[in-house]
């Protein structure tokens, strides 16, 4: 991989409590990676049980700490994305006896806290979504309300919203909700996408079949590992070296234009971030 080619992992987790964030970022950089978006892990995986709005800050602050660790390896080339994992609603309702409306209100309050970090410049973007697994109609409705609240915040902040949703290539309804709140479809990013997505920008999991589908489409896309930094699941979902290695593979397969699209054009259009690589 050419040294002046930026390589972005659009969705990666670093765990300062249980994981080895510095080692993970070093592996990414050694493989040719240059830029990272670091997302907070679900609060419960960090040992944080949220009962009130302010409880979300502990997980957010730990994620910022992990991003600062990443910046020691990649100076100025790592950003934080904060929000509330959509699976929290099931944890609250099924395991902790919250009413659905109470769970929704707490999750919306957590997003309000995340929005404060974006407004202060401590985070680049928000994350939200809805469960990717079967839930009741009541939970699905509440989850969509949380998602729309996140879109409203993104519109107010003029920032990107990353989404964790069901496996789908059609988020056109979400794109309509976004437009109603002043958010363009391209600034709604579908995490763990398997190819192009209607109504959002695809952040494609860096597996070969999924990347071929994205590269062949001519649509804007990003690449991600969804790395968990979990010692009990080493390398899950994909290891930190994967995006730079897959970018190299795409070039070898004749998809050089797609690599530029995923790592230069789309990040600039969607996030407005500077992906220049300092000379060595």
Show the residue positions of the predicted features.
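Short acidic/histidine-rich active-site segments
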Residues: 219-238
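Structural preference for beta-strand elements that scaffold enzyme active sites
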Residues: 5-9, 35-37, 77-83, 123-127, ...
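Well-ordered, non-membrane alpha-helical segments in soluble/globular domains
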Residues: 21-23, 50-69, 101-115, 143-148, ...
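Surface-exposed, active-site-proximal loop segments in enzymatic domains
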Residues: 48-52, 88-103, 135, 139
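An N-terminally biased module of ancient metal coordination in phosphate/nucleic-acid-related enzymes
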Residues: 1-79, 119-131, 136-141, 165, ...
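Mid-to-C-terminal alpha-helical segments outside catalytic/metal-binding sites
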Residues: 6, 152, 244-280
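Divalent metal-binding pocket/active-site signature
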Residues: 18, 106-193
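Active-site-proximal loop/turn and secondary-structure-junction residues that shape catalytic pockets
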Residues: 14, 42-43, 84-88, 130-132, ...
């Amino acid at each position: 991989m050419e040294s002046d080619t930026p390589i972005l992992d659009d969705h990666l987790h670093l765990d300062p409590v249980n994981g080895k964030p510095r080692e993970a970022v070093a592996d990414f950089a050694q493989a040719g990676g240059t830029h990272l978006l670091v997302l907070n892990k679900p609060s419960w995986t960090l040992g944080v049980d949220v009962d009130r709005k302010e409880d979300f800050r502990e997980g957010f602050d730990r994620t910022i700490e992990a991003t600062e660790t990443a910046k020691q390896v990649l100076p100025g080339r790592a950003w934080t994305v904060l929000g509330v994992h959509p699976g929290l609603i099931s944890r609250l309702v099924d395991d902790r006896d919250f009413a659905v409306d109470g769970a929704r209100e707490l999750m919306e309050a957590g997003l309000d806290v995340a929005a404060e970090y974006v407004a202060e410049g401590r985070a680049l973007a928000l994350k939200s979504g809805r469960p990717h697994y079967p839930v009741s109609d009541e939970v699905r409705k509440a989850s969509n309300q949380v998602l729309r609240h996140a879109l409203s915040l993104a519109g107010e902040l003029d920032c990107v919203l990353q989404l964790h949703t069901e496996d789908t290539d059609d988020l056109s309804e979400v794109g309509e909700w976004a437009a109603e709140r002043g958010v363009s479809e391209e600034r709604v990013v579908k995490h763990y996408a398997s190819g192009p997505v209607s109504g959002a920008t695809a952040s494609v999991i860096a597996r070969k079949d999924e990347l071929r589908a994205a590269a062949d489409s001519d649509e804007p896309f990003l690449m991600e590992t969804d790395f968990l930094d979990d010692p009990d699941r080493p390398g899950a979902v994909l290891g930190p070296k994967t995006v730079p290695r897959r970018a190299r593979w795409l070039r070898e397969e004749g998809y050089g234009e797609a690599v530029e699209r995923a790592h230069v054009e789309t990040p600039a259009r969607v996030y407005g971030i500077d992906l220049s690589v300092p000379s060595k």
